Amino acid sequence: MQSAGAVGVGLFFGLSGFLITALLLEEYERNGAISLRAFYVRRARRLLPALVMSIAAVAVAGAFLGPLFFTWQMAAAALLYLGNWALVSGKDLASLTHTWSLAVEEQFYLAWPLLVGFVMRGGRRAVVLVAGLGIAVGLTWFVWAVAVGAPWYRIYFSSEGAALPLLTGAATAAWMGRRSAHAMPSRFRHVGWGLILMGAALPERATVTITPVTTALAVALVLPHAASCPAPLLESRALRWFGKRSYSIYLWNGPFAYWLREVWHWPWWGMLLTVVPAGVLLGAASYRWIEAPFLRRPSPLLTNQTTPAADSVDDETRAHGLTSTTATPAQGGRALSP
């Protein structure tokens, strides 16, 4: 279960890098520039209300469950999007461990739009080149980390390791452009799915070590064929519903999964039957009464702006919905510790 979750997180990174890059490139080609202010403001409006509310709920629970469940140091790491580096340094985020992947994503989004806006003066090829350079650096770091015997959590939770699938997704989006889904031979797609299944089947410690590389390869081989998926599936109301609420579901699944796994030692099937329904209900409630009302309020910071890529944030969270429920068990990094 945890191996599948680790693979799911890596695939989410790849999907996220692909989608946000495609949206940024589309905005640049439409407007001749990327509205960075709109991008960052809209991300804050989309992400922070639910995150703050979920951390507040965990803090209240921590008052009864004790410091093993919650501390204010954990909350600070989550709110500042430094959770992954807290785990790399050996600290335990307990019920907020799942926020490490949000930290990785936001660190990427802090720098990548700036870089895309600059290098797009040279066209999509320049974006592919820069992303490819980042992938090469990431692979070099990965080989070095394995060679020197770095701990698994140093590889899995680090920004360097997670950059591989993120940049691979970004490079794929820039390379695809207006190319047909058949630009890459379909047999490559089968290799990509094979890598995904292999990662999910391997022992968990092996999976988390090689996940940055295997998921990056899978993203490069599978994503170019995404457009060939049946339209009714991609446009289904159920997928859109889960996509819009997947971020909240992910936030609420994490504390439940940690408590049931680490404290009560529930089996995976018991967690699946309990955590997923509870997360869906709480996530749906959060989206309806916290996120949606906040997003409907006009922001003075977004007046007189060009149409930004961040307007399509629901397209991004739709991708999150493909992995959010399966990824939760793997977020508890200490569960893999000796």
Where are the language model's segments positioned?
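Functionally critical transmembrane alpha-helices in membrane proteins and complexes, commonly lining
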Residues: 1-26, 45-51, 73, 80-83, ...
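Alpha-helical transmembrane segments of multi-pass integral membrane proteins
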Residues: 6, 166, 170-171, 190-292
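Membrane-interfacial alpha-helical segments at the cytosolic side of multi-pass membrane proteins
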Residues: 20-22, 54-60, 108-121, 168-175, ...
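Structural signal for the C-terminal ends of transmembrane alpha-helices
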Residues: 21-29, 61-64, 117-123, 171-180, ...
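Transmembrane alpha-helical segments and their boundary/interface "anchor" motifs
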Residues: 26-62, 77, 101-110, 134, ...
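Membrane-proximal cytoplasmic C-terminal regulatory module of class A 7TM GPCRs
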Residues: 236-238, 292-321
